C-alpha cells in the first residue's frame, strides 16, 4: 500500500498542472495583499459603511494580517475546490485515458487498494495546497500588515475577535476546509 501511495504521489507531483495551481493561488493571494496594502483603509471604510458616524474606528488598525487572511479565505472558498477537482479528477481519468488503468488492475493489487492510494494521494495534495495557502495568506499577511483584533461583519452587526483568540480559529478553519474538500 505504501508503494502505491508513493507512486500516486509521484504521478501527481511530477505534472506541471499541480504546480500551476500553487502558482495561481500564490499570485491571487499576492494580488489581494498588494491591493489591500495600497488601498486597505478605503476598502475597510467601504465595508463598514456608515459605522464611522456612530463609532470611532481606526481603519489602519483594522486592516491587519488576520483581516487579510480572513478576506483571502472567503475569496478562495470557490476557487480552491475547482483546482482540487481538476487534480483529483486527473488522478483516475488521466490513468484511464493513457490506458494504464487496465494494466494496473491486472496486477496482484486489489482495486480497493488502488482507489484508496489515489484517494490518499489526493488528500496529501489537498493538505499541501491548504498548507501553502495558510503560509502565503496568514504568515505573509502577518509579516506585512502586523496583528491586531479582527472585526468581522455579521448580519446582526460587527463581531470583534481579540488577537490572542484568532490563531486557533484559523487552524480550525483550515482543518475544516481540508475535511470539506475531501
Describe each PLM feature range.
Residues 85-105:
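Transmembrane helix boundary and interhelical loop/hinge segments in multi-pass membrane proteins
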Residues 26-89, 117-181:
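Secretory targeting signals
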Residues 1-26:
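Aromatic- and glycine-rich beta-strand/loop motifs that create alpha-glucan
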Residues 112-116:
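Alpha-helix N-cap/helix-start motif at helix boundaries, enriched for small hydrophobics
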Residues 11-15, 75, 94, 98:
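Membrane-interface junctions
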Amino acid at each position: 500500500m505504501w508503494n502505491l501511495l508513493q507512486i500516486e504521489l509521484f504521478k501527481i507531483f511530477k505534472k506541471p498542472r499541480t504546480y500551476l495551481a500553487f502558482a495561481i493561488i500564490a499570485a491571487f493571494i499576492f494580488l489581494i495583499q498588494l491591493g489591500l496594502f495600497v488601498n486597505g483603509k478605503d476598502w475597510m471604510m467601504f465595508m463598514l459603511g456608515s459605522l464611522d458616524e456612530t463609532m470611532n474606528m481606526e481603519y489602519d488598525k483594522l486592516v491587519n494580517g488576520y483581516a487579510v487572511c480572513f478576506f483571502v479565505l472567503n475569496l478562495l472558498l470557490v476557487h480552491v475546490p475547482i483546482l482540487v477537482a481538476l487534480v483529483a479528477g486527473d488522478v483516475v481519468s488521466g490513468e484511464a485515458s493513457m490506458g494504464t488503468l487496465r494494466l494496473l488492475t491486472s496486477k496482484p493489487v486489489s482495486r480497493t487498494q488502488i482507489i484508496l492510494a489515489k484517494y490518499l494521494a489526493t488528500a496529501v495534495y489537498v493538505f499541501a495546497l491548504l498548507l501553502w495557502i495558510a503560509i502565503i495568506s496568514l504568515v505573509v499577511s502577518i509579516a506585512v500588515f502586523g496583528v491586531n483584533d479582527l472585526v468581522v461583519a455579521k448580519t446582526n452587526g460587527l463581531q470583534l475577535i481579540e488577537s490572542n483568540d484568532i490563531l486557533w480559529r484559523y487552524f480550525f478553519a483550515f482543518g475544516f476546509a481540508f475535511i470539506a474538500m475531501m
